[in-house]
Amino acid sequence: MRMAFERTVTTDKSFDEAVTAIEKKAAEKGFRVLYVHDVAATLAEKGFPRDPLKIVEICNAKYASQVLAKDAKISLMLPCPISVYITGGRTHISTMLPTAITAFFPEAGIEEVAAQVEKTVLEIIEETR
């Protein structure tokens, strides 16, 4: 059985409206936007044009500190990425489920923190759509 590791929603917002809404909603929920990667622009610069795609990196220092105290290698999966992209003319918002991290670090005991972060991240994308 395949483990669910992501959630994707479709929105009627334009691409730019969705990116801006994610940034605003993340701040409202206590997360800081660390960086927005314009993947489409980067690929286009290298000769690989594609439909719009940005990755919004968000982080909550309290939660990050808690999981990193358990295992520094969890940093490989931080910060929380939220992707906004266009496929088939529709704007989509996707995120990796933070609880999926627990499968990679079962001894870390981060299930409770991961569940709290996941609840908030899912609220961010649902309230943004």
Provide a role label for each language-model segment.
Residues 1-33, 126:
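Terminal, regulation- and interaction-focused segments at domain boundaries
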Residues 19, 66, 103-105:
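Short acidic, gly/pro-rich beta-turn/loop elements at beta-sheet edges
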Residues 104-129:
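Well-ordered alpha/beta subsegment
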